[in-house]
Regions:
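Short loop/helix-cap segments at secondary-structure boundaries that form the rim of catalytic
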Residues: 41-47, 89
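Catalytic cysteine-centered active loop of the rhodanese-like fold, especially the PTP/DSP P-loop
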Residues: 52, 64-107
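Glycine-rich, highly charged phosphate/nucleotide-binding loops
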Residues: 52-58
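Short active-site oxyanion
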Residues: 27-32, 48, 70-72
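Conserved beta-strand scaffold positions in the cores of enzyme catalytic domains, especially
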Residues: 14, 32, 49-51, 96-98
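Flexible, polar/low-complexity N-terminal or interdomain linker segments that lie immediately upstream
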Residues: 1-43
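Short amphipathic alpha-helix with an adjacent loop that forms part of the alpha/beta core around
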Residues: 21-24, 59-68
Length: 108
């Protein structure tokens, strides 16, 4: 492990905006998940995304209701909350990917 590995994620589930958008568009079962707060979501989001506030007390219960047949593409403002949320999804057996850099990294 070199000194830069902690600064630059090299995980197969952490994707740049172009790659994540491409995988989502090519997926026949993909779900975009905005894990920001409701006010953030209502202000601006990626069209078609659902909102699941990672910081809400009910987040874990919402996650447990998700369809295991779907693939989840998770994002937030900067990539921190979504990285943690995507990890939670994977821990319960869901397929999920994190948008590195957050909503601003999504290509328009």
């Amino acid at each position: 492990m070199n000194m830069f590995s902690s600064f630059f994620p090299n995980k197969e589930h952490d994707l740049d905006g172009r790659t994540l958008k491409q995988r989502f568009e090519n997926s026949n079962n993909g779900v975009l998940v905005d894990v920001r707060t409701a006010p953030e979501f209502n202000n601006d989001t990626i069209p078609g995304a659902i909102n699941m506030d990672f910081m809400s007390p009910g987040f874990q219960k919402e996650v447990e209701k998700l369809n295991k047949e779907k693939t989840y593409f998770v994002f937030c403002r900067s990539g921190g909350r979504s990285s943690a949320a995507a990890s939670v999804l994977r821990k319960i057996g869901l397929t999920s990917f994190n948008l590195i850099g957050g909503i601003g990294a999504w290509p328009h």
